[in-house]
Amino acid sequence: MASLAIAFPILPGKTEQWKHFSQEMAGPRHSEYEASRKRLGETREVAYLQQTPQGDMAVVYMEAQDIPRVFEGLGMSQEPFDVWFREQVKEIHGVNLSQPLPGPLPEAFTDWRAR
């Protein structure tokens, strides 16, 4: 199982919208969110709000067999939830998930687990 943590800056003034977006996925749109992630091959996704002096960031942790496939699938999907999700990400983060990310995916340097 592969994992990834990635940070997305939240555009100025969009933090409350990001919180509402997250609440939508945890609440009224949870079944659509879950179906989307299962369809994309994810097994876990956690989003954190990180407040910094430079601005707020969403830090997303995910697990899947094929992380690049998750991004590719999400970028191409025409499922209504995935289209809505991409629109929210573009509006809140300024990131167009229909296009390749503007750089390589983050590289893990340490991975400690209790045994």
Language-model features: where?
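Local beta-strand/beta-hairpin segments that build beta-sheet-rich folds
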Residues: 98-115
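An amphipathic, aromatic/His-enriched active-site/gating alpha helix that lines ligand/cofactor pockets
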Residues: 31-43, 64-103
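Short, well-ordered beta-strand segments in beta-rich or mixed alpha/beta enzyme
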Residues: 5-9, 18, 45-76
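Long, hydrophobic N-terminal alpha-helical segment
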Residues: 1-30
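N-terminal low-complexity, charged segments
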Residues: 20-43, 47-50
